[in-house]
Amino acid sequence: MLMPKRVQYRKTQRGRMKGNAQRGTAVTFGSFGLKAMEPAWITSRQIEAARIAMNRYMKRDGKIWIRIFPDKPVSKKPAETRMGSGKGSPEFWVAVVKPGRVMFEADGVPREVAVEAFRLAAKKLPIKTKFIVRPDYEG
């Protein structure tokens, strides 16, 4: 599971997901990418499930890059707890993903294999996604 080794603050405010992604919108490492079309919190478990689905389909061929990292702690109070008495303890970690963000990249496999691998990965994510190809890709 992905999570930071250490953080400056144990708990963060929830924040808002306004607008589109400003950075990380282009395929830079691989030839193919999976782009987010909606804003969402993607948990470390969802990222891991998508990674495993892609790796299983691609077997040993190719390389995968994960372009998002869950660096935001989400706190939760225990069940059946009265209101008040402070903020709950951090339960899990999320990556804040805005529309246009490239979440995963792949290289070293044919286009058809990449399309299917990303389709399987997209099923593990709670948002609409889009398969994109690097502009200078020849294949």
Swiss-Prot record:
Q: Which InterPro entries match?
A: Ribosomal_uL16, Ribosomal_uL16_bact-type, Ribosomal_uL16_CS, Ribosomal_uL16_dom, Ribosomal_uL16_sf
Protein keywords: Ribonucleoprotein, Ribosomal protein, RNA-binding, rRNA-binding, tRNA-binding
Q: Which SUPFAM superfamilies match?
A: Ribosomal protein L16p/L10e
- Segments of this protein annotated with the region Disordered: 1-21
What is one term from the GO cellular component aspect held by the record?
cytosolic large ribosomal subunit
Biased composition, class Basic residues, residue ranges: 7-17
* Example of a GO MF term: structural constituent of ribosome
Tell me, what is an example of a GO biological process annotation in this record? translation
One Pfam family name is: Ribosomal_L16
The superkingdom of the source organism is Bacteria
- NCBIfam families found in the cross-reference section: rplP_bact (TIGR01164)
Q: Which family does it belong to?
A: Belongs to the universal ribosomal protein uL16 family.
Give the protein's function.
Answer: Binds 23S rRNA and is also seen to make contacts with the A and possibly P site tRNAs.
Subunit structure, interactors included: Part of the 50S ribosomal subunit.
In terms of HAMAP family, this protein maps to:
Ribosomal_uL16
Q: What is this protein called?
A: Large ribosomal subunit protein uL16
